[in-house]
Amino acid sequence: PHAVVAMAALERKKPVYVQKPRTHSVSEARLLTETARKHGVVTQMGNQGHSGEGARILCEMVWDGAIGPIREAHAWTNRPVWPSGLEVGRPEETPEVPPDLDWDLWLGPAAERPYHPAYHPAKWRAWWDFGTGSLGDMGCHIVDPLFWALKLRYPVSVEANTSQYWPAFFQKADPKNEMFPRSTIVRFGFPAREGMPEVNMTWWDG
């Protein structure tokens, strides 16, 4: 996990340039921020799209008023391209760990579970214990230009819908609900800011 490696560097007072996803939770993000401040260390999260010419051109167009006031924005990805929303629980098979994989190191701070190719490589993104789903995986790339161009900060409202509804998950009563859904729609409402009107941004995946 990036947060674990980043924390180890920060505690040694080393500057950190960390790739996304920087953390797995909000609490981890806050802990990294506090540690960086404590040691006076410069940090930055990498996002290659933010350095691209396309993002800068978008900002210039919006800031110059080329397309007028923006009150609605949409962001979409075809993710997940890995198995998601499976209501089958964890794999029961326990195949051997590949010889070139340190499974304990790979798990990091996540709870212990046997190795299975349903998690690694790549498919870990779909599991709550390891990934952040489609929004966490691609949102920082796709939504970043909108945040930059529209000078967005914190939303005043958020509404989410998914392709699956599992009341038991929120009560931690059903062990089968450990994966992110196949698709989601998330609507964010942002207030007026810096001469720009209120804007609604909708995230679509699946």
Q: Can you name each region flagged by the protein language model?
A:
Residues 3-8, 28-29, 55-56, 82-88, ...:
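Short, solvent-exposed loop/turn and secondary-structure capping segments
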Residues 3-51, 65:
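Beta-strand-loop-alpha-helix segment that lines the small-molecule cofactor/substrate pocket
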Residues 38-39, 89-103:
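A catalytic-pocket lid/entrance helix-loop region that shapes and gates access to the active site
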Residues 52-75, 89-92, 136-165:
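Oxidoreductase and adenylate-handling cofactor-binding alpha/beta cores
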Residues 66-84, 98, 102-113, 156-166, ...:
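NAD(P)-dependent dehydrogenases' Rossmann-like dinucleotide-binding region
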Residues 104-196:
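Rossmann-like dinucleotide-binding domain that binds NAD(P)(H)
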Residues 192, 199-206:
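Phosphate/diphosphate-binding loops
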